[in-house]
Amino acid sequence: MKSLLRAVLCALLLVAGALSAPSAQPAHAAAPPSAAATGTAEAWTPPLSTRGRYIVDAQGNRFRLRSGNWDGAQGSWNGSGDRDDPATHHSGQNAHGIPIGLDRVPLPALLADFRAAGLNSIRLPFSNEMLRDTAPVPDSAVAANPALRGRTPLQVYDAVVAALTDAGFAVILNNHTVTTRWCCGLDGNERWNSGRSTAQWADDWVFLARRYRDNPRVVGADLYNEVRRDVFDDPNWGLGDNHDWHAAAQEAADRILTEANPQLLIVVEGINWFGLPVDGFPHGRPTLTPVRTLSHTLVTSNKLVYSAHFYGYTGPRHSGATGIGETSDLRYQDMTAAELEQTLYDQAFFVSAETGTHFTAPVWISEFGIGADESGAAPRAWFDRLTGYLTRSDADFAYWPLVGWSTTAQGTPGGDTWALLRYDTAGRRSGVLDPGDWRTARWSPLTTTPGRTGPVPATPAWYQLTTDHRDHNASLRTRAAGDWDSGARKAVCPDGARLTGLAHTGGRGLCTTSDLRAPTGGHTVVRDERYVPAGGDWATGYTKFQCPAGQFLIGYSLRGERVSAALCAPARTALPAGGRTVWFDRGDNRPAGGPGGDFALGNYKGQCLPTEYAAGIAFTTRAATRPSPAALLCRPLPGPAAG
């Protein structure tokens, strides 16, 4: 029924658009012919998921996000003055809390231009305030789309989502701001929980994800935009407090996947800024650098995408300000080509480039951009270098912003010169599809240069478990069975994975993909040595929590540092016995190359070989000795098919 409603809505919009198109002259020049800009929708099958560094469709074929940011629903008001005065809005453009341009161009024509620009996906920002705004938008805000008159901002957003997806675009929802106003500075929208709780923020995400769950081309939830310092406090990645962006993203992601839509990609942007931008004081733009040592393991595997933003006027330690708030640190546009490439790698691209680690994931550069009127040599060189790097890296990307004005409401020159596609009051277009825009020479190779296509084979994945501040139960099957060790901190591998490594201290673990588990049956909680057979002492003098025969480790629990229990699951096939003891209480004991990456930085770690499964944990409660994990029992897997 909802698919039918979307189709009807799209048809109405097509008719309304045809009736209301400006008649002064054709508004849209023909697009230059190219492989990515043929005017036809790219063939792909939802939902999307991930395989290593790539996003793939339901057939396992690579789907590269070639995206634009269609902003407006997050707000355009600058935060002071009369909201009805265009001068108080970014670049003089009053979006009225809906995607910009609907006052000037019929939706079908806009979507045709998006396709001509080589795009297959749209990042669609919204504000939490927009979700609750019950006032209809002014008729003038949708003048070119009269079918949208009388609708609230959320209802207009619904119509835009339906039109985009019915036209074949993938849509990634982006929580950009809390209040409907322009981002980003000290604006009250610095964190996901600015002016509200993390639970309330996650509630909004569950609401919106449920709203579109019957539309399979709504493919992703981009959790929050440019998390940054407010007046008094910094965000952090892993401290466990109310400002912990890593933990908040984990909470919202798991709620979206369990309560709303398990098919969505979850997009997590790194931290955009911390500290005071004053020389001599700690400050900077961490972006994705913390992911190397603390990544996310979600309850639904192969759904995680990391994202980052890059603008030439900012830098790794430069706020982007001029005057107050400016430091002597390098901007990206001040770097040499080699410096820029190394910085891009260190801040973001290592996540996708370094395969076979717990943090390996697709990286989406979900914002970058520059003005069509930019004449400076350094900013232009930066844009050339960045787009070249994105092309050579075969990266997923989203330009900011996609749509803007070229004239004011009065018809005089104005609007956002950064927009990829600009429209005057008559709907006439200018931008990268038209003569005279210097950016076209950089944009076209980015969207048309062939990258990887076709099937992407599944490869072993690695998952980090952390009990730093709370439980980390990534298994839906285990969650459904209830609390298996009340009062202890618990960690469980995702369904379809097995435990393969543990840290001696710190409570972290490492899992890897495995189809070893039986499709039915529960789990076994091991709190003593009852399953250690006579003559099978594999860690003399140590307490051994060993899985029953035919079972393997999927989780563990701790009380303080002390091992509390081991969690085991039955295998779908007979498991070999025997094995070896892997000690790690006095140093690392891992396979060559450290597959999975450093999952517990600064702590001793033990890990079974990729050809082994873990069947037991040993520890001691002797005086003056840590009661934390000290050894693993590693046994050979039954064969390649079971690994």
Question: What is the predicted function of each stretch?
Answer:
Residues P47, H90-P99, D103, G195, ...:
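Extracellular glycoside hydrolase catalytic/binding regions
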Residues S20-T40, R452-A458, G643:
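N-terminal low-complexity, Pro/Thr-rich disordered segments
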Residues M1-A31:
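Secretory targeting and sorting signals
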Residues A458-G643:
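Lectin-type carbohydrate-recognition ectodomains
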Residues G68-A73, P125-E129, N174-V178, D222-V227, ...:
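Active-site-proximal beta-strand/loop segments in catalytic clefts of secreted hydrolases
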Residues N94-I122, M130-R132, P138-G220, A247-R255, ...:
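An active-site-proximal structural segment forming one wall of the substrate-binding cleft
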Residues A29-S121:
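N-terminal carbohydrate-binding accessory modules
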Residues S375-P460:
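Aromatic-rich peripheral "rim/lid" segments of glycoside hydrolase catalytic domains that contact
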